[in-house]
Amino acid sequence: MRAYELMVLIDPEVDERTVEPTLKKYLEVVTNAGGTVDNIDVWGRRKTAYEIQKKSEAIYVVVNFQSEPAATQELDRLLNLNETILRTKIIRPEEQKITAE
């Protein structure tokens, strides 16, 4: 299992109350493959740095989860098929190194 961080930009016309339940439906791919969802953090509506699909705002969501690489690829594929999702990015956060001084 590897730790991942997913950032999703969702169409601002979507009701913010439906964002988390909708994402949980997609995150079932991770849990069905034996992974865990650690945190879903809805940042809310924010201005984007540049227009994405002719929209200058988006609803930002950050999800921390642990999964196998195959389940992560399938999650990314399914999210990109949804028309209300403007952009996705999945990264593996770097482990912090503890140094003794």
From Swiss-Prot:
Entry function? Binds together with bS18 to 16S ribosomal RNA.
Provide the gene name from the record. Answer: rpsF
Which domain of life does this protein belong to? Bacteria
Name of the protein in question: Small ribosomal subunit protein bS6
InterPro entries for the chain? Ribosomal_bS6, Ribosomal_bS6_sf, Ribosomal_S6_plastid/chlpt, Transl_elong_EF1B/ribsomal_bS6
GO cellular component terms given for this protein = cytoplasm; ribonucleoprotein complex; ribosome
Q: Which CDD domains match?
A: bS6
- What is the organism of origin for this protein? Micrococcus luteus (strain ATCC 4698 / DSM 20030 / JCM 1464 / CCM 169 / CCUG 5858 / IAM 1056 / NBRC 3333 / NCIMB 9278 / NCTC 2665 / VKM Ac-2230)
Keyword vocabulary terms for this entry = Ribonucleoprotein, Ribosomal protein, RNA-binding, rRNA-binding
**Pfam families of this UniProt entry?**
Ribosomal_S6
* Calcium is among the record's keywords: no
